[in-house]
Amino acid sequence: GAMEVQTARTGGISVVDDLQAPSHGQLEQPRLDFSVRVSGQLAAHIDATCQALWQKLQARAGRKSQSLALRGIQSKSDTLRGLGRKPKQAALVLRDNLSQRRSIERSYLRAIARAKQEVLVANAYFFPSRKLLAALCHAAGRGVQVQLLLQGRYEYFLQAHASRAFYARLLQAGVAIYEYEASFLHAKVAVIDADGRSPWATVGSSNLDPLSLLLAREANVVSRQREFAQELQNRLQAALAQGRQVQAADLAQRPWHERLFDRLAYALARSMVWLVKDHF
């Protein structure tokens, strides 16, 4: 019979060596990234998702005589056995170009809307939708401490400059922005109200950018386990300490050509989003 899967992992960790950057060579410190190991039925659910996708790709490649349709595998609440002794609720949240185009974005929006104390997001590639941007600003406006840990090293033109086009509005709304400079940031994680009544945390493959939210196949694990949320929060706070906080004065003092690049990158990214939305 088929082997029963005991554990599974999901996260943002790349197959590339964490001490190597394709465009920068050897790194002094490894990339900052996260993955989560799950067990039980949630691991089996992840396995079923991978098996179904593998069958679909085999069929598409013509390796089977009949086409195998990928069954819609929905997000499922289950248990995540990790840092705490007792199993707690967790879910696998998927994004594809079929029935689950907005699932990860909706998960973030619901959690941010319910935030009472703190929202802490670490994202390598940050170009939020208008709804996500508004949700972050509204949360800060109602007194929630909103902190973003973003890429502090120059990696790609579009990513580096398009993200900074959002800084002024976020800072004006009261959002704290930190740029991680110890190494390259590759994390796609968030923690909300880790010490509150309804903790929420996610670790996965999805950035808050158009590629992840509109095009790519992504998978995040969402957990409401307090111990898990607090441990992730502690690790992110340590990473914030290695970052540089961006001040409004910093934006005004940037060279004119850098600000021009921000506007150009933003306009290019927005046009790409428009094309993608029109296509899908």
Regions from the language model: what does each represent?
Residues 1-280:
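Charged, low-complexity intrinsically disordered terminal segments
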